[in-house]
Amino acid sequence: MASSRASSTQATKTKAPDDLVAPVVKKPHIYYGSLEEKERERLAKGESGILGKDGLKAGIEAGNINITSGEVFEIEEHISERQAEVLAEFERRKRARQINVSTDDSEVKACLRALGEPITLFGEGPAERRERLRNILSVVGTDALKKTKKDDEKSKKSKEEYQQTWYHEGPNSLKVARLWIANYSLPRAMKRLEEARLHKEIPETTRTSQMQELHKSLRSLNNFCSQIGDDRPISYCHFSPNSKMLATACWSGLCKLWSVPDCNLLHTLRGHNTNVGAIVFHPKSTVSLDPKDVNLASCAADGSVKLWSLDSDEPVADIEGHTVRVARVMWHPSGRFLGTTCYDRSWRLWDLEAQEEILHQEGHSMGVYDIAFHQDGSLAGTGGLDAFGRVWDLRTGRCIMFLEGHLKEIYGINFSPNGYHIATGSGDNTCKVWDLRQRRCVYTIPAHQNLVTGVKFEPIHGNFLLTGAYDNTAKIWTHPGWSPLKTLAGHEGKVMGLDISSDGQLIATCSYDRTFKLWMAE
């Protein structure tokens, strides 16, 4: 056993030199330190290298190095349209979530209507409608709804104010006058209706033959007399009730009376200082009225209204109260009242027996130009520069008919003796015929090539209609039928006034050419 151990030990000792390996020598650790600190030191000392000034500049230009303050992060100023839309939509949704919308569906519909949106869409329920309103309000803002409501309230209030009936409190004399007019007009209306019944009993053949004779006579009308009336244009002419005199008004301020049919000057009425708009005879003048009484009335552009007798060249009285132009004057059929139209958008009624203004009637939006009275004395018709006409009941003060249809100013208005037709002449070159019974326009006559200055029905039966215009002519139209019968041509200037004698035998026209003409059948 000892020998075996010795042999093994010896074997080991003999093998050791072959397997001997050199021991590993420990190398000391190398500490490089912080590269960041060294780089900072190198940069601080201004050393050149890869990351020197040139390298730093190249890195910044290449976009590999970003130098920031650490507090502010700069972004691109330009934002794409898509990004802007996304931001706007985000803000809109944010606003929409903050808007309170009523859960009452009727109120939601009212809000949509106020905003001018459809109150409902196809297949839309209350929830979808409410959401649609919310989205709309998020775009236009809730102030839009408030503004719309305020505008609606204002328009509603103004509409209520417009529809509100307002009036001037009239004097007691107006009440007395209304009662007097009612008592005056009712018997005349009964008489007119009785005459219409008697006329209807006349055989049709007789009436037709009479109408044919009248039309034949009208077609034969010729210029019987032409007279220079003044140095200035003649604005108005009017026959006396007995058809023996003709009154003319001139722009020189003079009014003249002429004999008919020889056209001799009888009187020159001096009193106006400016353009005279109209002169009219009293309904009973030259028939039953004393020549010393008031027989004529005239008006002028300075607002003056004067009353005249047949015995004096000076005015008998002045009617004061108009501050602007008075366009027309007209006597009531009774002769007690005088109507005046004024450019202050009103017309007035004067009681000459009481010597006071009893009615100051407004209703037109512009100046009132012409006035006419119904032959019964119950109604008055006015035509205004606002292109509208009105028919007034003098017994109650109400406007019973509104004449709407002309495109321009109304310069003439007249009632037919049949009691239910009204004719109006306008600046739109037409003459319209209105029916009081139907309360509408029944016919429009394309009468002239220039503005129509006057209209006049034949005063006995209203069998024809006369119109005058700025196209230098006057025309005669059948009634009924409204077909042209005769054109009265001869004036060298605008036809400014016209009239038909009370017996229906003569027609007078006056013109801008300073002449007046009488027309008579051969």
Swiss-Prot record:
Keywords: Acetylation, Disease variant, mRNA processing, mRNA splicing, Nucleus, Repeat, Retinitis pigmentosa, Spliceosome, WD repeat
CDD domains in the cross-refs: WD40
Example GO BP: RNA splicing, via transesterification reactions
UniProt modified residues of type N6-acetyllysine: 27
Name of the protein in its database record: U4/U6 small nuclear ribonucleoprotein Prp4
Region: Disordered, residue numbers: 1-20
Oligomer status and interactors: Component of the precatalytic spliceosome (spliceosome B complex). Component of the U4/U6-U5 tri-snRNP complex, a building block of the precatalytic spliceosome (spliceosome B complex). The U4/U6-U5 tri-snRNP complex is composed of the U4, U6 and U5 snRNAs and at least PRPF3, PRPF4, PRPF6, PRPF8, PRPF31, SNRNP200, TXNL4A, SNRNP40, SNRPB, SNRPD1, SNRPD2, SNRPD3, SNRPE, SNRPF, SNRPG, DDX23, CD2BP2, PPIH, SNU13, EFTUD2, SART1 and USP39, plus LSM2, LSM3, LSM4, LSM5, LSM6, LSM7 and LSM8. Interacts directly with PRPF18, PPIH and PRPF3.
GO cellular component: Cajal body; nuclear speck; nucleoplasm; nucleus; spliceosomal complex; spliceosomal snRNP complex; U2-type precatalytic spliceosome; U4/U6 snRNP
Protein role: Plays a role in pre-mRNA splicing as component of the U4/U6-U5 tri-snRNP complex that is involved in spliceosome assembly, and as component of the precatalytic spliceosome (spliceosome B complex).
Result of changing residue 192 to H: In RP70; does not affect nuclear speck localization; disrupts interaction with PRPF3; does not affect interaction with PPIH; does not integrated in spliceosomal snRNP complex
WD repeats: 229-268, 271-318, 321-360, 363-402, 405-444, 447-487, 490-521
Organism, as annotated: Homo sapiens (Human)
GO molecular function annotations of the record: U4 snRNA binding; U6 snRNA binding
Major localization listed first in the record, in broad terms: nucleus
Clinical condition linked: Retinitis pigmentosa 70: A retinal dystrophy belonging to the group of pigmentary retinopathies. Retinitis pigmentosa is characterized by retinal pigment deposits visible on fundus examination and primary loss of rod photoreceptor cells followed by secondary loss of cone photoreceptors. Patients typically have night vision blindness and loss of midperipheral visual field. As their condition progresses, they lose their far peripheral visual field and eventually central vision as well.
PROSITE patterns: WD_REPEATS_1 (PS00678), WD_REPEATS_2 (PS50082), WD_REPEATS_REGION (PS50294)
Listed Polar residues bias regions: 1-13
A Pfam family annotated for this UniProt entry: PRP4
